[in-house]
Structure formats: structure tokens, C-alpha cells
Design a protein with these regions (language model features):
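Short acidic (Asp/Glu) and glycine-rich catalytic loops that position anionic groups and cofactors
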Residues: 9, 84-90, 173-179
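His/Asp/Glu-rich mid-to-C-terminal helical/loop segments that flank catalytic regions of hydrolases
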Residues: 34, 38, 155-222
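Catalytic-core environment of secreted peptidases
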Residues: 1-50
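Sec-exported extracytoplasmic/periplasmic mature domains
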Residues: 31-41, 67-71, 109, 113-117, ...
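Beta-strand segments within the central parallel beta-sheet cores of soluble alpha/beta enzyme folds
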Residues: 44-53, 78-81, 214-216
């Protein structure tokens, strides 16, 4: 859960509703959990869905979960993160933050192919987005983590339209009371993203392998007994 609260210093609406950041991410977690629950055959692995708090205060909720994990860290196969799902329609690409660090990117690429999409790296790594959401605490603990969502190459309008939509959100709604629900949202891209991440998660949940960090990655899997 991600909420900035209220700001009495503001004129007019003082409430940061956080409709996109991050009510959409929480709704996405619930949707994927429901999809797992309704499958006729349960997954081979346990799948945990966690909505943590205080992301905007320094990723404190996910930090607490990792530091007080009910499970030994080396037994956690992977982390898949959802945060602020884009609402500007379907895209031809998927942006993976920290692309190339772990074999989860290979799983993502294979799943994206079934949707006719390609996976690309974040084109602004200097902004440190990989370390600004809750998956970062799992990565620091050595657990391969995936954070991916629709890229900016939109089916309708291409890169120009995607960048315009992203810039408009950042300038006018990101971390502002104006981040409200909009009845004109285009859910097609979000649905594609949730189906994609479900596929990656379900594939991992039905296998015994553990995703690994690639050579040269900034992290390594936790040693037995690590907390």
C-alpha cells in the first residue's frame, strides 16, 4: 500500500488518493492472486501475495518483510513487483528495470513473445528507478527480483505518444492530489501486463528451479540460513 496522506498546506483538495501510484499496483496483486486461486490445478510451489506499506517512506514495509521473513531467504525463489501500472493503452514493448541482472528477464522475454511484445531495458538508468520500489529490498537480500510493465512504444501513437503520456502523468499527477481515478483510463495495457506477470509467476510456481543472478550482477543469492 502506498499513500502520501494529506497536505493541509494545499488549497482545495488536500488528499493524495494515489489512484495510479499505487492503488493500481495493489489491485493488480489482487487480480493475479484471484487468477491463481481459480486455477483447477494448484501451483507446485507456495505463492505469497504481499501488499506492503511505507514504500514512499523509504521502502520500509518491504524492508521489514525481508528482515522478518517467515521463510528462510534461500527458499524464496523470486520476487515479482507491481507498482503504478500505466493506464495509457497497450504497448509493443515491456520495460524491465535492472534488465540483464537475473534469469527472470529471460522468463519475462519468453512470456512477452507470446503477446507479440519485446522486453527492453530502462532507458533512464541514471534515475535509479530499480532502487525506488519494493523489489529492491528483495534484490539486496539476494533474491532475484522482477519489476516490469508496459513500455512507452504504444500500439496507438508509438514512442511519441507514450513519452507524452508518461511526461504528462509525471508533471501533473505523480505524487500529487490530482492522482485520481479517471473513467477514461485505457485498461488494455494493464490487462496485458497482468497476464504477462501471471504467466511468469505461474511458470516459476510450477517448476523446481531457482532463478539466478547473472555473472556481473550487483547481487548474489542468499546463503543457507541467511536472514
Amino acid at each position: 500500500w502506498d499513500h502520501l496522506g494529506t497536505d493541509a498546506r494545499l488549497d482545495g483538495d488536500p488528499v493524495y488518493n494515489g489512484a495510479i501510484d499505487n492503488a493500481t499496483g495493489v489491485a493488480g496483486i489482487i487480480e493475479i492472486a484471484e487468477a491463481f486461486a481459480h486455477q483447477a490445478t494448484p501451483p507446485q510451489r507456495s505463492v505469497v501475495f504481499a501488499a506492503v506499506t511505507l514504500e514512499e517512506s523509504g521502502l520500509l514495509g518491504s524492508q521489514y518483510l525481508v528482515e522478518h521473513s517467515p521463510w528462510a531467504l534461500e527458499r524464496i525463489a523470486a520476487n515479482i513487483n507491481l507498482d503504478a501500472l500505466p493506464m495509457h493503452g497497450p504497448s509493443r514493448n515491456v520495460t524491465a528495470l535492472g534488465y540483464g541482472q537475473s534469469t527472470l528477464d529471460d522468463d519475462l522475454t519468453e512470456a512477452a513473445k507470446t503477446q507479440g511484445r519485446i522486453v527492453v531495458a530502462d532507458d533512464e538508468p541514471e534515475k535509479g528507478f530499480f532502487f525506488r520500489s519494493d523489489h529492491a529490498n528483495f534484490a539486496r537480500a539476494g533474491i532475484p527480483a522482477l519489476y516490469a510493465s508496459s513500455g512507452q512504444d504504444l500500439v496507438e501513437g508509438g514512442l511519441a505518444a507514450g513519452r507524452k503520456a508518461a511526461d504528462d502523468y509525471t508533471a501533473n499527477r505523480y505524487h500529487k492530489p490530482s492522482d485520481n481515478y479517471d473513467p477514461d483510463w485505457d485498461y488494455r495495457g494493464v490487462i496485458a501486463d497482468l497476464e504477462l506477470l501471471y504467466t511468469v509467476g505461474r511458470t516459476l510456481a510450477d517448476e523446481s528451479r531457482f532463478p539466478q543472478w547473472k555473472p556481473g550482477a550487483d547481487f548474489s543469492r542468499p546463503a543457507p540460513g541467511a536472514k
